Amino acid sequence: MDNLKLLEEAKKARLKAYTPYSNFKVGAALLTKSGKVYLGCNIENATYTPTNCAERTAFFKAVSEGEREFEKIAIVGAKDGEDANEMCAPCGVCRQVMMEFCNPKEFQIILADGENTCRVMTLEEL
């Protein structure tokens, strides 16, 4: 799947985010090496500690379905009502989850960088 198409999937996932506290909605689309795409959105909680990021939601869905090999992830984020066209990098906890399951030299992270453009980097480069 091409990077811009994967970003479009992440934008769809972002629409399902539950963010009553920050109003910052994030979507992620995780492509497995088997070709399946798993979507995730951020899900907030009033105490913040149990809040789950979009990236981890996508990974946990995939792992719970038996996936263990991943190719790349597209991530988008913005305030509710805004276009998700600016870079939104994964937090440290999400990076650690990626390190657990992915080769940092190969796993690609795709971030929106404009309406129809993106930046691509490996987990190691991030």
Q: What kind of feature is each model-predicted range?
A:
Residues 9-12, 54-62:
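Short, well-ordered amphipathic alpha-helical segments that serve as non-catalytic structural scaffolds
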Residues 19-21:
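Short Gly/Pro-enriched turn/cap motifs at secondary-structure boundaries
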Residues 31-32, 112:
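Short beta-strand-to-turn element immediately C-terminal to the catalytic PLP-Schiff-base lysine
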Residues 42-56:
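Compact, glycine-rich, soluble single-domain proteins
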Residues 23-31:
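Short beta-strand scaffold segments in enzyme catalytic cores
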Residues 31, 61-67:
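Alpha-helix C-terminal capping segments
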Residues 2-16, 67-126:
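C-terminal binding/interaction regions
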